[in-house]
Each structure stands twice: as structure tokens, then as C-alpha cells.
Amino acid sequence: MKILHHGAVNGVTGSCHELQLDDKQGILIDCGLFQGAEVSGDKSSANDLEINFPIAHIKALVVTHVHIDHVGRIPYLLAAGFEGPIICSEPSALLLPLVLEDAVKIGFTRNKQLLNQFQSVLNKRIVSVPYGKWHPVFEGLSVKLKPAGHILGSAYVECQVGRARQRKKMIFSGDLGAPYSPLLATPKAPYSCDTLVIESTYGDKNHEGRSSRRKRLQQIIEKAVADKGVVLIPAFSIGRTQELLYELESIIHQSSDKPLDDSLKWGDLEVIIDSPLANDFTKSYRQLKQFWDKEARKVLSQGRHPLSFENLLTIDDHETHLQTVRYLQRTARPTIVIAASGMCAGGRIVNYLKALIEDKRTDILFVGYQAQGTAGHDIQTYGERHGYVELDGKRYSINAGIHTISGYSAHAGQRDLLNFVKRMRHKPREIRVVHGDEEAKREFKLRLEQLLGDSTEVVIP
């Protein structure tokens, strides 16, 4: 039995891990897309989407959550001949077809008949599994999904291999969420395992607390309004967008009658989601209220609607998108715009950036990790020194204000990751650190070794 890594070993994207029982049977945990300059373990890049490892023995795919860097290569996996089930949580079973339809449109075809055929195949493969229940995959292997607190439907995966005294337990963390995130319950540490494969996106840093980051969010908006400008927030269509809406509704609800400036109250500030996919996900989030945390359900019981409030405008069609970009470029009306992609590597956010990034009144707020090689990473890196960024082959000066609030990353910080291990009753004998930049992985490995001593071997694959 061994664990192989086909992604998220040289960065944070392209997650794909294999638990191989022998040369005749194994499973995959995730099958994600590479983004930016990141590559796989065998140096396959974001532009090389082929499945370049043997899959004849792969009996099932287990999905931790539906972000594209964890599921984006599923169409290629199916095209390569994979015929097993796609196992995921109940919320992910609803969300996954939306994500992959969008991925197929971008990477393969927009032909409606072919899209319908793909969705038909996908829906037959998806097996939804309740949280906390053992699910037999084949003889000698069962999996259990536990809430990971990253996005709705996210899970870490417990794999139980063998029988009785020879039984081994492997855990794949997927992406773990930060505690006290909007809408989601804090993930609980597992009881025990033999081997833990754990992410390290923020293995070298901690996030600010929720009340602090909400205060900063409010301050950034107040600054932009004072500057008579637009706040642009590049965000993943799923997860971060809904968390931001929840926080914005809360700020607006508490301050609705308070003036932002001489002519605008909080209650009159427009919030725009310009992303058809984000709008679809937000509708699905509303359908999945039973999976929200206690705080969010309490807000609903008060008659409030944190994902569909009065100030919220949604844009679906492309012409309205272009009209909105031109209008904001012309007027710089104080507005909050949330648009994909989260790393500015395409999507509608790029048009807003081209129109507004050179305007000093604009503020750009990053709320998620920016992978090397993406426009988002360049803006974040060179913005403070008023450098430039290349968008669609043209250079743009970065005159906008650049801000980062890491707590909305939906990822656990270093302290949270350490607590996930620390709170296990029986510690793993081996920990494999993946899904992080080199510095983050090294720092997290060091902290784990300090915590666990010689009883656990900590490796970076």
C-alpha cells in the first residue's frame, strides 16, 4: 500500500492524490486543475491537462470539495477511460455539475447536446454520501467524509483499509477551513489515523480574527466611498463570494441608517455580483440551508436574507456586464463589485481591472490566495510600488489601492492546521505535507516536528 501524489506537490493547485492498495486497486482523492505557473509532480503544467498516470486500477474518485483546483481535471479523467463512481458529500453532489459544466464550456465545447451528454454521464457517476457515515468502496476499503469547513460541502476523507487488527486509517485533509467562518461550522479534528496527508496553504502564517477582518472590510469600503471610487473584489464563484455576501449583509444591516458620506448611506450602497456561475452557486447555497451553521440559521430566523438582500444586484448576461463596466469607468460611482476569477486569471474581473486599475479612486481587495504566475499575484506583489500588470497582452499601471484580507481565504491558518493535528487523540505515525508554497511547507513541517517530536515522521513529498 502506498500514497502517490499527482498534483498539489509544487504549489497549491492541481490537487490529486492516489491511495494505492496494490497494482490492481486504488482510489483518487480529487482531480484538480493546475493554475498559474504551478506544475504537477512530473512537471506537467497548467496547459497540459492530460491524465498522465495509470488509471486502469483506479476504482473510485473521492471529491473533497468542488473548487476547480480540486475537480477541474475530472472531464479529462472521464475521457481517459475512468469508469468508477465519483464519491462526494450531499452538498457537493448538487454543486459539482455546475462547476464542471462551466469547466467543459471553457475547455471543451459549448455545444448544448455535448454538454447534456456530459452531464448525463456525470450524474450517473456521482454518489452522494452523508457526513460521518462509512461508505464501502470495494472489499477492504471504506471511506468516511467529515465536514472540513472550507466551503459548503467540503470534507476531509478518512480511508479505512484492511480488516480487524491489520486495519489502517489514512486521512486526506483536502482544504481545511478557518474557524468561525461565515455559514460554516468549524471542522473537528479526527480521533486517530496512521497517515495524514495535510494541506499547508497558510502553513507559515496566521489569519486575523473574524471581527478584525470584518472591521477592515468595512474600513476599506468606507475609504473607497470617500475616494468616490469602486471596490473590486476578485473572488472564487463558490465559497468566498457567499462568505463575502454574508458579511456585507451583516455590515449593511447593522449600519443601514448610518451615512457613508454626505450623499450615501450604507443602506443605499450597491453590491454587484457579476458572475453567472457565482449567481448559480448562490442560489444553490440558499437551497442547502440545512447545511449552514447555527449562526447563519439564526439570521434566517430573524427574517433576514444574507445571500439575497435588498442592496444586491446580480448580472448574468454579457451585454449587461459590458454596460456596467463602461458605466463604472465613466462615473466611478461608489459600488462593490464581486467577480470571478479569484486569481484574476480570466473571467469578468479582468474587464473591470482593465477599466479601473489605473484610476486612483479604485480599491482592489484580495480575499484569497494568489498563485504565482497569475495576474492577481502580480497586482498584489507590485501594487504597493505602483508597478504594472499585464492583462490580455497589454500593460496597465497599478494606480488603484491594493488591500488583502487573508481571513476570507477559506483556508485554515498555521495555528488552525496545527490544532487539527494537536487535537487528535492518537497522533499519526506519518504526516505528508502538501498543497503549499515551498516556504509554507517547510515552516509547517518544522512546527509539526516541534509539536510531535520523534513519534511522527513528517515528510514533504
Q: What role is predicted for each listed range?
A:
Residues 101-106, 212-213, 248-252, 286-295, ...:
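Short secondary-structure boundary/capping segments
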Residues 25, 81-85, 227-229, 267-269, ...:
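A short helix->loop->beta-strand "cap" motif at the edges of active sites that frequently abuts
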Residues 220-375, 390, 434:
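Hard-cation-handling environments
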Residues 417-448:
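C-terminal structured "cap/appendage" subdomains that terminate the fold
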Residues 40-42, 182-197, 290-297, 370-397:
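Short, compositionally biased "basic patch" segments
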Residues 347-356, 409-425:
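A short, acidic, amphipathic alpha-helical segment used as a generic capping/interface helix at domain edges
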Residues 1-62, 67-71, 76-243, 247-266:
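His/Asp/Glu-rich metal-coordinating catalytic cores
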Residues 389-421:
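Generic long, charged, amphipathic alpha-helical segments
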